Amino acid sequence: MARLALLSVSNKTGLIDLARRLVEEFEFDLISSGGTAQALKDAGLPVTKVADYTGSPEILGGRVKTLHPRIHGGILARRDVPSDLTDLENNQIRPIDLVVVNLYPFEETIAKPGVTLAEAVEQIDIGGPAMLRASSKNFAHLTVLCDPAQYDEYLQELRQNNGVASLEFRQKAALKGFLHTASYDSAIASYLSGTQQHTLNGTELQSLRYGENPHQPAAWYQTGTTPTGWTAAKKLQGKELSYNNLVDLEAARRIIAEFTDTPAATIIKHTNPCGTALADTIVEAYQKAFNADATSAFGGIVALNRPIDAATASELTKTFLECVVAPDCDAEAQKILAKKSNVRVLTLADLSTGPKTLVKQIAGGFLVQAADDIAADTIQWQVVTERQPTADELAELLFAWKVCKHVKSNAIVVTSDRTTLGVGAGQMNRIGSTKIALEQAGDKAKGAILASDGFFPFDDTVRTAAAAGISAIVQPGGSLRDQDSVKAANELGLLMVLTGVRHFLH
């Protein structure tokens, strides 16, 4: 008797090729349900609908299709237990040798803006997880596949083992099945419970050479079943990404996501920007960002919000860089970058979308917070000094504020001409960060803008900035001594704007 395969998938990637090989090369019979059966039929493949096999029609608008003893009996039967085989024979149930199933796209659904509870609930799969768990449990006697990435390996197993997948492969596939259902149920529980329950699930994408330091083991995990963010990036050249590369790439992505309307470039070292700039072209933006701190840019991570062209590629090859990421990279640019073969060059079409929540572990638990993604243009800024801003000053203040948001606290950023001139990051007091940023800016601080991620507890930052030639300041406000800083700004002829929003970053 021909072997029997049950196929019921939401993600139909690779389905037809797999099914054709099963039928033509290994003489499987196919049973399937719903849209999967229709896809197989449309491809000209012989398939029996589950409803015809079980004798029970799909009901409740498709909510009940595979929940039937002829399905689950065929999956769960132990081929080495005589009573199980007798039960199959008495109930006219064929043993199922292969189950190919993946689940309704629940996580993709709840990620959509404005999705309703009713829409989310309809994407909670019932029959799929039941089949996935049952077939994973019975891996001693059948194979379960829940990811299109497994299909080719499974076919190779059949070819190398006289048409039967090895026990080692079946057990590995079963583990993947249980991990898949565990992640799926966790996503549902987290969604329905709101803040009461938070579960973080991931599948190891690759082992990393090490973590932040060589003595720290590390790995890269993918959340969800569909590649998004960095798991969807395409590496065009270069060595494997390291833990630190990925951390810095994400820091770069967060900055570049602030700027969509104008070509923008940022260069990151240890998660802080050493240069960020806007310009009319992407090559000009990169040149400005690089020249903002050419010393620190050596060995940096570059993110661009426009495709890499030949001119930009030529500039990128003039110094040592760890990684470059952009939405795309044309063929001529790739040829130029290939001369620096060790540079990791990635393309990621969507550099704007990041995680909505951030997780940090502490002893005995973990902390969860919403991402700091409040849009700068939705904040009601307040001009608190006698001097009022020009349109160009407002644009510069906004640029400085957006960059400062992504600098480790205490953070001070000095900018001019939509380019960072000095970045003071991570100091234990604000005046210390101010002095670092102003020292980097040097004479270019005259007439420039200063942004702070937190309020000024004293007027010393204002006075230090004025002494260096700063013309305008943007900061959250909220100090009991705000008036001291406002008074100093008026006294010294500075413009000051309060945003009312703090951007600490630890």
From Swiss-Prot:
BP terms from Gene Ontology: 'de novo' IMP biosynthetic process
SMART domains, per this entry?
AICARFT_IMPCHas, MGS
Q: Which Pfam families match?
A: AICARFT_IMPCHas, MGS
Recorded catalytic reaction(s): these are:
(6R)-10-formyltetrahydrofolate + 5-amino-1-(5-phospho-beta-D-ribosyl)imidazole-4-carboxamide = 5-formamido-1-(5-phospho-D-ribosyl)imidazole-4-carboxamide + (6S)-5,6,7,8-tetrahydrofolate; IMP + H2O = 5-formamido-1-(5-phospho-D-ribosyl)imidazole-4-carboxamide
Q: Where does the record place the MGS-like domain?
A: 1-146
Q: Which HAMAP family match?
A: PurH
Write down the PANTHER family for this protein, in alphabetical order.
BIFUNCTIONAL PURINE BIOSYNTHESIS PROTEIN ATIC, BIFUNCTIONAL PURINE BIOSYNTHESIS PROTEIN PURH
Write the protein's name: Bifunctional purine biosynthesis protein PurH
